[in-house]
Curated annotation (Swiss-Prot):
Membrane-crossing segments per the record: 55-75, 90-110, 137-157, 171-191, 223-243, 273-293, 313-333
Source organism per UniProt: Rattus norvegicus (Rat)
Protein name in the entry: Prokineticin receptor 2
SUPFAM superfamilies with a match to the protein in the record: Family A G protein-coupled receptor-like
Tissue: Abundantly expressed in the CNS and reproductive organs with the highest levels in the cerebrum, cerebellum, testis and ovary.
Purpose of the protein: Receptor for prokineticin 2. Exclusively coupled to the G(q) subclass of heteromeric G proteins. Activation leads to mobilization of calcium, stimulation of phosphoinositide turnover and activation of p44/p42 mitogen-activated protein kinase.
């Protein structure tokens, strides 16, 4: 259940109504209904699909574990300690919240759909639409949050006097969610359940978007709009931001005498920018195959839909795209952040023996107040 925009199918010869286009977010697509059905073979029973099912299951389990636990730790620590609430962490919190919701709400249903029931939806229309909508919103929030972080870094390093304040950041965060929620509305509006005959006398209930056949042009226009606004545009903008930042940090001479503190700050900023560029690269590598596959499938369907294992390949490509949330969580929450230290202190405070009384809480807050929320040596203090 990845990006919901690219899954569409035009074939009125099966169970879906003949005046509709089936757009199946749970990985059914433009030419799915055009594939000749073999009465003797169910694609879900092939060895290729079995192998893909294992890969998908492992990936979904990883997302639930890494994104569920990691982002919960980050959110809990951020809620408990005000010192963690700098501009950068507030922007990262958008990623954490969206990925956490997907990990605990969407992934269990996806595990049931892909792995347990092997492409059959058994949870009703409301959950079908809700899960797909939440998954789509999460993708757009993640993309827009990464873009906001890149802009924040650009302003902080290239134009430090113009850096965002908390009021501007709050407006930007609200805009990130508002845009994501609005753009994803079609994924909920057009989502329904569809019964398909996979092999003779065998049916599966698919959860997906059903676009009227006379709205094919609208669907394609909508997909291209989202592709430009939520992939091409952000990637180009982030690339330009980090290119300009790199020029500032690596190729611009620093005037005056460089103290050890200045050199340390410069090294820290360089490492941070390298981390952010790595995250951008991972985002492109994870999502470019999915968008590319979707474009070929929706605009040049004859190139792929006759391939026997085309659907299985699409599931794997989508699985790779979904796994990007794990990379974000590992990089932002567990690798280069002080969040784990604060979370451990919070647990220590909670489980501390009662005879220490209220003093333990005061002592803990006093001690943590001297620990930077984002350490220079860890290269995540970005001011």
């Amino acid at each position: 259940m990845g990006d919901q925009n690219g899954n569409t199918s035009f074939a009125p010869d099966l169970n879906p109504p003949q005046d509709h286009v089936s757009l199946l977010p749970l990985n059914y697509s433009y030419g799915d209904y055009d594939i000749p059905l073999d009465d003797d073979e169910d694609v879900t029973k092939t060895q290729t699909f079995f192998a893909a099912k294992i890969v998908i299951g492992v990936a979904l389990a990883g997302i639930m574990l890494v994104c569920g636990v990691g982002n919960f730790v980050f959110i809990a620590a951020l809620a408990r300690y005000k010192k963690l609430r700098n501009l950068t962490n507030l922007l990262i919190a958008n990623l954490a919240i969206s990925d956490f919701l997907v990990a605990i709400v969407c992934c269990p249903f996806e595990m049931d759909y892909y792995v347990v029931r092997q492409l059959s939806w058994e949870h009703g229309h409301v959950l079908c639409a809700s899960v797909n909508y939440l998954r789509t919103v999460s993708l757009y929030v993640s993309t827009n949050a990464l873009l906001a972080i890149a802009i924040d870094r650009y302003l902080a390093i290239v134009h430090p006097l113009k850096r965002m304040n908390y009021q501007t950041a709050s407006f930007l965060i609200a805009l990130v969610w508002m845009v994501s929620i609005l753009i994803a509305i079609p994924s909920a509006y057009f989502t329904t359940e569809t019964i398909l005959v996979i092999v003779k006398n065998q049916e599966k209930l698919f959860c997906g978007q059903i676009w009227p056949v006379d709205q094919q042009l609208y669907y394609k226009s909508y997909f291209l709009f989202v592709f430009g606004l939520e992939f091409v545009g952000p990637v180009v903008t982030m690339t330009l931001c980090y290119a300009r930042i790199s020029q500032e940090l690596w190729f611009k001479a620093v005037p005056g005498f460089q103290t050890e503190q200045i050199r340390k700050r410069l090294r820290c900023r360089r490492k941070t920018v390298l981390l952010l560029m790595g995250i951008l690269t991972a985002y492109v590598l994870c999502w470019a195959p999915f968008y590319g596959f979707t474009i070929v499938r929706d605009f040049f369907p004859t190139l792929v839909v006759k391939e026997k294992h085309y659907l299985t390949a699409f599931y794997v490509v989508e699985c790779i795209a979904m796994s990007n949330s794990m990379i974000n969580t590992i990089c932002f929450v567990t690798v280069k952040n002080n969040t784990m230290k604060y979370f451990k202190k919070m647990l220590l405070l909670h489980w501390r023996p009662s005879h220490y009384g209220s003093k333990s809480s005061a002592d803990l807050d006093l001690k943590t107040s001297g620990v930077p929320a984002t350490e220079e040596v860890d290269c995540i203090r970005l001011k």
